[in-house]
Amino acid sequence: HWDAGQSRLFAATGPEGKVFAIDPQGRSEVYFDAEDGHVLCLAADGDALYAGTDGDAVVYRLRGPERAEVVHDFPGNEVTALAARDGMIAVAANEMPAPRRVTSKNRRSKAASRTPRPGKGRLWRVDADGRAERLHRHDDGHFTALAIDEDGTILVGEGKEGRILRVGPYANAGGPGTAATWVDVDERQVLAIDVGGDRPVFVTGDSAALYRVTEAAPDEALWTSKVLDAEFRARWGRLDWRGRGRVQFQTRSGNTEEP
């Protein structure tokens, strides 16, 4: 995180859970040393700098060098993303599974080299008085990025299906916890979202891409549903479509996990 007022860059690190302050000459010093294994994310609002950690999913408010206080200890085992604006903090607190372990021929246990398993995502809001409220939950995947728009709407990126959700934290923005898909891309992970410019932008991983969001509607769109396991012999029903424009349906069935 770049602090223009202090002309310093703050860097969150692991595995020792330290936040470093780096001046324009490249000199660094430890600004905060957490008891947690990793500091995963930083966010600022005015003079306050916030840090999210793994292990116990704690959010700290950093008021100065080695001056920190706990904002909240969230359920889960990591705070992956933070966003702060006008006294409100948005927190992505995930419950991530432990890495799979495999045993080699020499009986040494090591982490398996495969795509990480998705966790369970929880989106929280902390108000200016420190009250925490859960706004949204996602049991089929975890959250990886956050941003707060001018009207207080929270944009939350997913780490499994390449979607960004719009979640309204206030009654005039759709009601607490009301979520709708805002963006859906082919890439699997949404890693960062920026709403500070003329047009929102976001970056993805697996694979890497940079997107700019425009107001124009796309010429065409594709939506793929999740696989439905009927668990016994089943028969197709009927598909109905209500709306304008040309639409095409394609279906697939079979006896495998992914037909």
Where are these regions (language model features)?
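A short loop-to-beta-strand structural motif that recurs across blades of beta-propeller domains
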Residues: G17-F20, V58-R61, R114-W124, R163-L165, ...
